[in-house]
Amino acid sequence: MRQPFREGGTWLHRGDKGGITPGRAIRVVFIAILLGGGLAWPAEMLKKVSAEARLGGAAIGAEPALRALPWWSSLRSAKSDVPVVIALGAPDRSVLRAEDAKRESSEEKGTLRIGILRDLPAPFEFSGETLSWTQLADGSFVAAFSVISGEALGMRFGFTSLVMPTGVMAWIVDSSTGAGIACVPPEAFPEPLWWGPSCAGQEIWLVFHARPGANKAALSGSLVKIAHIYRDPVAEAKAAGSCNIDASCASEPWASMLSGVGGLGTIDSTGVLFCTCSLIVSLDTCENSPLVLTANHCVRGQTGTRGAENLEFYWLYQTSTCNGMPPSILTVPRTTGGSDYLAGIGGSGYSGLGSDVTLLRLRQEPPAGLTRLGWTTDMPPNG
């Protein structure tokens, strides 16, 4: 008898020889579909899914992605000493609009492009020996350099190498606000490059903070590419018209489930892409890994255990009040560090062999208190 592929719940089964058998994929119905209003559910099934969703409502613990850095005021007072190592002008917005219109008019199911990739005139090589360090009152040291990409809402940095010695931490910081996010490369550095987390602003500082006694000289890296983010998908959805209903206006049982619906940012050869995803209940109550379900076309081309290296996940981007102003996608809590691609299958989701679904496991915990959404293998009724 075939055993369920536990990391993927019950929607995929292992074949007789241990391989995943896509032809035996069971359609998974999850809460994000319901929030989209695409299905009519009988009351008994609604109660079942709602109850399963609430199983994941416990706080699971994580630090906020953005934080005010305690040494920011000291660094800001010496802003003139932070060198601008890369300064790129604003891209031609008319060209971007034309490209986006062509993408979005295609019949093929696709993702929303929110950013472009920009090559640098030359790779910027840096090391602890070449950076200018400032000692703080507590005996620690900071060093920084600045990158500008004209009219960017935010950026991500692409590195071919980033060596962080013990006691040294890198931060991606909005130069105008001091809001920072940790930039922690994986132990196994991906090829051909690794993308750091996104940060709001058209001028971003890469800041290094070294504890007293840390071997600063061992720090090194190579910045080779910039992801220039020029669209906010949440703001655009708000402006799209009455066809987009504010989820914060929904009544129970949906209101308690909104926090389990997230955004997903990824990078491929065409630029920075945005999709939605769902944080779902795990059947493994011992491990309780943070699992995310999304469409396969959102992450296609990223396969294997470490194939979802550049993904980041955005949470709590819903409006705080019915028809209120949405927050910027670049300022909400997020989960960085990539994810593991557990299983997936292509297809249109409407016809053919595949149902266009992918299961991911986050490498870092999402913020505390998010609802883990229920799911069922029951077929939904037509409607």
Residue spans for each PLM region:
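Short, surface-exposed beta-strand/strand-loop-strand elements in extracellular ectodomains
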Residues: 164-178
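Extended extracellular/luminal ectodomain segments enriched in beta-structured repeat modules
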Residues: 149-156
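Solvent-exposed serine/threonine-rich low-complexity stretches and specific carbohydrate-binding patches
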Residues: 180-189
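N-terminal secretory signal peptides that target proteins for export/translocation
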Residues: 1-24
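Protease-domain processing segments flanking chymotrypsin-fold serine proteases, especially trypsin-like
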Residues: 41-146, 189-198, 202-282, 286
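Serine endopeptidase catalytic core focused on the charge-relay Asp
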Residues: 198-383
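Solvent-exposed strand-to-loop "edge" motifs in beta-rich extracellular domains
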Residues: 160-162
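Bacterial N-terminal signal peptides
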Residues: 28-37
